[in-house]
């Protein structure tokens, strides 16, 4: 059996200081590693009241600097918000700096209100097309130069 933990930099009370939230998430990541968990996951969300998570690669890079063996999972990035070259590069760099600990996850998004802010005019139900288009490109970029 494998154990995974999804952690968001979220606060349930707007009076909670984000520094405390940040510190609490790092503490949970360290506890997960010490407790034998296999993967910790960070999500991508934009302009939601309860969380700050605009780039899971940044969060995971930070967690990776404070851990040694737990795998670092992107759960998930929204393909509609990323150019495939940026997505491939961010993922490859995190995998490099974490000594191969990246678990890559990409999806089509969860909340229409995020699409309204990030990709106005795109219906969340149609965003799978971005994923379908970008995944083969990302894979080719990881294999080498791709035009």
Segments predicted by a language model, with ranges:
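Active-site nucleophile and cofactor-binding loops and adjacent substrate-binding regions
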Residues: 50, 74-82
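Flexible, glycine-rich active-site loops centered on histidine and acidic residues
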Residues: 2-19, 81-147
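Conserved beta-strand edge residues that scaffold enzyme active sites
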Residues: 46, 77, 108-109
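A short, small-residue-rich loop immediately preceding and capping a beta-strand
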Residues: 70-76, 103
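N-terminal beta1-alpha1-beta2 module of alpha/beta enzyme domains
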Residues: 1-67, 71-72
């Amino acid at each position: 059996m494998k154990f995974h933990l999804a952690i968001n930099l979220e606060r349930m009370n707007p009076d909670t200081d984000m520094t405390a939230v940040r510190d609490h998430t790092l503490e949970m990541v360290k506890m997960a590693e010490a407790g034998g968990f296999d993967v910790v996951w960070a999500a991508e969300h934009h302009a939601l009241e309860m969380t700050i998570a605009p780039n899971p690669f940044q969060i995971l890079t930070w967690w990776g600097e404070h851990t040694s063996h737990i795998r670092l999972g992107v759960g998930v990035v929204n393909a509609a918000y990323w150019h495939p070259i940026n997505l491939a590069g961010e993922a490859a760099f995190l995998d490099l700096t974490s000594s191969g600990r990246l678990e890559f996850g990409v999806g089509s998004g969860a909340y229409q209100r995020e699409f309204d802010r990030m990709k106005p005019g795109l219906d969340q139900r149609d965003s799978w097309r971005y994923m379908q288009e970008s995944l083969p490109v990302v894979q080719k970029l990881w294999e080498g130069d791709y035009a």
